[in-house]
Amino acid sequence: MFRYLFVLSRPRFWLYLAGPVLVGVSYGATTVGELFSAPAVVLFSYFLLPANIYLYGINDVFDRDVDETNPKKDGRESRYRGGAAVAVIVAVCGVFLGFVAAPLPAEAWPYLAAWFVLATEYSAPPLRFKTTPVLDSLSNGLYVLPAAAAYAGVSGTHPPLLAVAGGWLWAMGMHTFSAIPDIEPDRAAGIQTTATALGADRALAYCAGIWLLSAAVFALVDVRFGLLLLAYPVLVFGIRRLQVAVGRAYWWYPAVNTLVGMVFTLGGLWGVVHG
C-alpha cells in the first residue's frame, strides 16, 4: 500500500507544491534564521508529501473511470485501486492541514484555506472545477498558494499582490499545458476542459499567451522576474517549431519548473544574505 501511495503522490511533481514554499520563504525571510523557522519547515514538510497525497488522491478517486482510457496511467502514473485504507489516508492528509495552519500567523490562513478548497473542489463534486472550461485553468492557481502561505507564515505580512497574480497566471498556463495530452481521453469520457474546448493547437497558443501575460505581470514586480518567465512562451515556440509532441514535452516540465524555481529562490536568498 505504501508503494502505491508513493506512486499516487506523483513524486515527479512533488516540487510543484513544495517548491513554491521555498520561493515564498526565501522572499518572506529577512534573516538566515527565518529560513529554517518552524513555519518554513512545517509548511515545506506538509506540501512535500501529505499535500500531494491529498491533491492527487482526491483526483484519482473521482477520475477513476476517466483514467481507464488515459495512456499517462500506463507508465509513470498509477490508476486508483480503491480500498478503505487508501481513502482514509488521503482524507487524513487533507484534514492534517488544519493542524499545520493552527500555530501559523493568521495572515497565512486565507491562503491555506483557499488551497484546501481548490484542491478538493478541483476534482470532487459538487463544483468539480476540472470539468468546466476556464474554471479548470483558473482554479489551478492553487499551486501558487503554498508560496503565499509560506511568505505570510515567515514574515507575518501578506505577499505582494502582483507576485501572487503573476504566479497564478503561470499556474493557469501549466494546467492547460498538462491537460493537452489528456484531450482525447477526456473527450471520450465526456469531460470538458479548457484544453478540450480549444483543441491542441489553440490550447498551446493559449498557454503561450497566458505565460506572456504572467511574464508581464512579474516584470511589474521586478524586470528580472519577467525575463525569467519568458522561458515558458519561448519553450512553446520551440515545441511548435520542432513539432515536438506535447505528450512528450509534458515530462520535461518538472525539470524546467525546478530550474526556474531555483533561480527565483536563489534571488530571494541573495536578498536575505546581502540585504
From Swiss-Prot:
It catalyses: all-trans-lycopene + dimethylallyl diphosphate + H2O = dihydroisopentenyldehydrorhodopin + diphosphate; isopentenyldehydrorhodopin + dimethylallyl diphosphate + H2O = dihydrobisanhydrobacterioruberin + diphosphate. The chain crosses the membrane at residues 13-33, 38-58, 84-104, 107-127, 134-154, 160-180, 203-223, 225-245, 253-273. Keywords: Carotenoid biosynthesis, Cell membrane, Membrane, Transferase, Transmembrane, Transmembrane helix. Its EC number is 2.5.1.150. It is a multi-pass membrane protein. One of its GO terms (biological process) is carotenoid biosynthetic process. Its main location: membrane. It is found in: Cell membrane. GO terms for cellular component: plasma membrane. It is an enzyme of class 2 (transferase). Signal peptide: none annotated. It holds the Pfam family UbiA. Disruption phenotype: Loss of bacterioruberins production. Inhibited by bacterioopsin. Pathway: Carotenoid biosynthesis. GO terms for molecular function: transferase activity, transferring alkyl or aryl (other than methyl) groups. NCBIfam families: PRK12875.1. Involved in the biosynthesis of the acyclic C50 carotenoid bacterioruberin (BR). The enzyme acts at both ends of the substrate, and catalyzes the conversion of lycopene to the C(45) intermediate dihydroisopentenyldehydrorhodopin (DH-IDR) and the conversion of isopentenyldehydrorhodopin (IDR) to the C(50) carotenoid dihydrobisanhydrobacterioruberin (DH-BABR). Belongs to the UbiA prenyltransferase family. This is Lycopene elongase/hydratase. It comes from Halobacterium salinarum (strain ATCC 700922 / JCM 11081 / NRC-1).
